[in-house]
From Swiss-Prot:
Belongs to the amidase family. GatA subfamily. The active site is at K79, S159, S183. HAMAP family: GatA (MF_00120). This is Glutamyl-tRNA(Gln) amidotransferase subunit A. It catalyses: L-glutamyl-tRNA(Gln) + L-glutamine + ATP + H2O = L-glutaminyl-tRNA(Gln) + L-glutamate + ADP + phosphate + H(+). GO terms for biological process: translation. SUPFAM superfamilies: Amidase signature (AS) enzymes. InterPro entries: Amidase (IPR000120), Amidase_CS (IPR020556), Amidase_dom (IPR023631), AS_sf (IPR036928), GatA (IPR004412). It comes from Brucella abortus (strain 2308). Its EC number is 6.3.5.7. The lineage of its organism: Bacteria, Pseudomonadati, Pseudomonadota, Alphaproteobacteria, Hyphomicrobiales. Coiled coil: none annotated. Allows the formation of correctly charged Gln-tRNA(Gln) through the transamidation of misacylated Glu-tRNA(Gln) in organisms which lack glutaminyl-tRNA synthetase. The reaction takes place in the presence of glutamine and ATP through an activated gamma-phospho-Glu-tRNA(Gln).
Length: 493
């Protein structure tokens, strides 16, 4: 069975088309793998055995009739942030206890319309707030990777830790994820997988639990660049239900793979050489530069002067939007309700019991920066900084730069229940140092594995592109992947 779960989406698609395997066989192989591994890894918070089998059966029937969709019979995991009709959707928060939506998110509806099979809902940081998948109400996810000679558990990154871990451990062929400040790219880098955060507006946000609406964007996590391109094609669409959705044709991203990068101008931002960056990250970056240079790309030094303000500005804008978005969870119409002596007391008791520590922290920060006395000093100033960050990128792209290469994370995956990080949220927030600028500017960014560190843990590089030019990112990421190879964890679970 494990040989079936080892297939990439592209390989499985070809075998299904050739009728060498059936969607039912493939789905059963994944369900068996999940049942055997989930107690150890905790990637899934709900496994939809019956639904998966009936979807696979329907796929086999369509394949037999010659009516196969682009993802026909491909078993996928869905981050618990996406509404799935009649299926557990709780954003891994106690506040949404028992919530089963009566509607389907646009992203998942697009995937099912193309024939994909749902295996279940994936663990994540509560309401997508976190960088280690330790804030989930359902407990932490364990990274399928371990350091050489060690049995210590590592985090898979966050907030899409369940998506990244499930893809790396072959518990799904690919997964949906979301990215507000790095929640696709950082876990992808920590698990040796590929994750792309599309341009803001490329993929519909409708039916996805909102964290920070001006920053949130859905995208795929997959085993390789080709699989990410295949998934992205199905996920992206114009959606009139999302006012930020952009009416642009969705290209065939897979067709961009293998195109030459000769003459492509790749920018290297000097501001990303941060103090205290480990030598192994600098080394990886240089390797990535060399891979692209060897393939014919032109490497240029660039400056993004407002980079150093991105993280503090992000941690004002994102909590501000979150405090507004999360006001709707009050125990009245759905989810958890804790009785109180009157309605105000019920709200208070429900929200106190329903939200975890990190979510409460961010709601309080957000409410504080939006309050009358501090709005101008914090929120307004952060929005002005955001405009300057966006302009930095526009200036660089105006000079002919096609893509920007940076590290994806400042380190490899760190230990589960790390006391230093648990006691210092700012240190945890620094995990997003290379990724938040992309969300602040609404640009596309992809994380691609580029090597292993001295302890045998995966490290990723990030490519940042012009708005709606995801094809360029797939093209350049494919070059790095071809040079660096692919990375799979040794099985311990």
């Amino acid at each position: 069975m494990s040989e079936l779960t080892a297939l990439t989406i592209a390989e499985a698609r070809d075998k299904l088309k050739a009728k060498a395997i059936t969607a039912t066989e493939l789905t059963d192989a994944y369900l068996s793998a999940i049942d055997a591994a989930n107690d150890a890894i905790n990637a899934y918070v709900a496994v939809t055995h019956d639904q998966a089998r009936s979807m696979a059966k329907a796929s086999d029937e369509r394949i037999a009739k010659g009516e196969a969709g682009a993802l026909e019979g491909i078993p996928l995991g869905v981050k618990d942030l996406f509404a799935t009709k009649g299926v557990h959707t709780q954003a891994c928060s106690h506040i949404l206890d028992g919530f089963k939506p009566e509607y389907e998110s646009t992203v998942t509806a697009n995937l099912w319309a193309d024939g994909a099979v749902m295996l279940g809902k994936l663990n994540m940081d509560e309401v997508a707030m976190g960088s280690s998948n330790e804030t989930s109400y359902y407990g932490p996810v364990k990274n399928p990777w371990r350091a050489k000679g060690s049995n210590a558990d590592l985090v898979p990154g966050g907030s899409s830790g369940g998506s990244a871990a499930a893809v790396a451990a072959h518990l799904c062929a690919g997964a949906t994820a979301t990215d507000t400040g790095g929640s696709i790219r950082q876990p992808a880098a920590f698990t040796g997988t590929v994750g792309i955060k599309p341009t803001y507006g490329r993929v519909s946000r409708w039916g996805t639990v909102a964290f920070a609406s001006s920053l949130d964007q859905a995208g795929p996590i997959a085993r390789d660049v080709r699989d990410a391109a295949i998934l992205m094609k199905s996920m992206a669409s114009l959606d009139l239900k999302d006012t930020t959705s952009v009416d642009l044709p969705v290209p065939d991203y897979e067709a961009a793979l293998g195109r030459s990068v000769k003459g492509m101008k790749i920018g290297i931002p000097r501001e990303y050489r941060v103090d205290g960056m480990p030598g192994e990250i600098e080394e990886l970056w240089q390797k990535g530069i060399q891979y692209l240079k060897d393939a014919g790309a032109e490497i240029v030094d660039i400056s993004l002067p407002h980079t150093k303000y991105a993280l503090p500005a992000y941690y004002i804008v994102a909590p501000a939007e979150a405090s507004s978005n999360l006001a709707r969870y009050d125990g009245v119409r759905y989810g958890l309700r804790v009785p109180g002596k009157d309605i105000a007391d019920m709200y208070e008791q429900t929200r106190a019991a329903g939200f975890g520590k990190e979510v409460k922290r961010r709601i309080m920060i957000g409410t504080y920066v939006l309050s009358a006395g501090y709005y101008d000093a914090y929120y307004l100033r952060a929005q002005k900084v955001r405009t300057l960050i966006k302009k930095d990128f526009e200036d660089v792209f105006a000079k002919g730069v096609d893509a920007i290469l940076t590290p994806a994370t400042p380190s490899a995956a760190f230990g589960l229940a790390d006391e230093v990080l648990a006691n210092d949220p700012v240190k945890m927030y620094l995990n997003d140092i290379f990724t938040v600028t992309v969300n602040m500017a609404g640009l596309p960014g992809i994380a691609v594995p580029a090597g292993l560190n001295g302890q045998g843990l995966p490290l990723g590089l990030q490519l940042i592109g012009r708005p709606f030019e995801e094809e360029t990112l797939f093209q350049a990421a494919h070059v790095i992947e071809q040079a660096a190879g692919r990375f799979t964890p040794a099985k311990w679970w």
